[in-house]
Amino acid sequence: MDVFLQVLNKYKFERVSSTLNKPIVVHSVPGAGKSSAIRELLKLDSRFECITRGRPDIPNLEGAFIKAERSGESKLLLVDEYIEGPIPEDAFAIFADPLQSTAVSPHRAHFIKTLSHRFGKCTDSLLRDLGWDVQAEGQDSVQIADIFTVDPRETIVYFEPEVGELLRSHGVEASCIGEVRGATFEHVTFVTSENSPLIDKASAFQCLTRHTKSLLILCPDATYTAA
């Protein structure tokens, strides 16, 4: 337990529960360092093993990486992206970013982190205006423009099927957010038919948090605000 708590403390996770019971629940926002903390824990202590319901790591020489399946050895089990699948009964700790998923109701957290190291203060301000509790300290840019007057650029993402069809009909290469979940890009264009994140808040949140340097939102009338 000591090394587990030490790693969470190093990565600035805040303890929000006075008692700890298994599985220990750790929640964070995108870019908070959750995966990095898990990888460090695996390298520091061979008693731990981690599986993910998301995208597993590429295997490394040490054998200390986030896996798709258990090895079969008796180890302290960590489960990343636990919201996306069943939780083994013997799980020691479970991790997730609940803001990115509506699969199931998240468990009550023991540790949280709302600070993202991925994007900057402009995205922080936008997300807070839209109702999400996310903080950031770096520098980035956010632009909101009319979908019919400004061309999309760089990495283009969407979540609405009709938006994908519109982009394809104009020969624009774009990715549905499900295809790039967990990935990050320097510059992202998010194309949407909405003026507020209403249809699917989790998918909209994912589209709004894929970038590290700049975000361009293309929507009707260049308006994207809280409902």
UniProtKB/Swiss-Prot annotation:
Disulfide bonds: none annotated. Residues 1-131 form the (+)RNA virus helicase ATP-binding domain. It is found in: Host cytoplasm. One of its GO terms (molecular function) is RNA binding. The keyword Membrane does not apply. Residues 132-227 form the (+)RNA virus helicase C-terminal domain. It comes from the Viruses. Keywords: Host cytoplasm, Host-virus interaction, Inhibition of host innate immune response by virus, RNA-binding, Suppressor of RNA silencing, Transport, Viral immunoevasion, Viral movement protein. One of its GO terms (biological process) is symbiont-mediated suppression of host innate immune response. GO terms for cellular component: host cell cytoplasm. Homodimer and homooligomer. Interacts with capsid protein. Interacts with host AGO1; this interaction targets the host protein for degradation, thereby suppressing the antiviral RNA silencing. Belongs to the Tymovirales TGBp1 protein family. Transports viral genome to neighboring plant cells directly through plasmosdesmata, without any budding. The movement protein allows efficient cell to cell propagation, by bypassing the host cell wall barrier. Increases plasmodesma size exclusion limit. Acts as a suppressor of RNA-mediated gene silencing, also known as post-transcriptional gene silencing (PTGS), a mechanism of plant viral defense that limits the accumulation of viral RNAs. TGBp1, TGBp2 and TGBp3 seem to act together for cell-to-cell propagation. TGBp1 is the main movement protein that physically cross the plasmodesma with the viral genome. TGBp2 and TGBp3 would facilitate TGBp1 function. This is Movement and silencing protein TGBp1. It comes from Potato virus S (strain Peruvian).
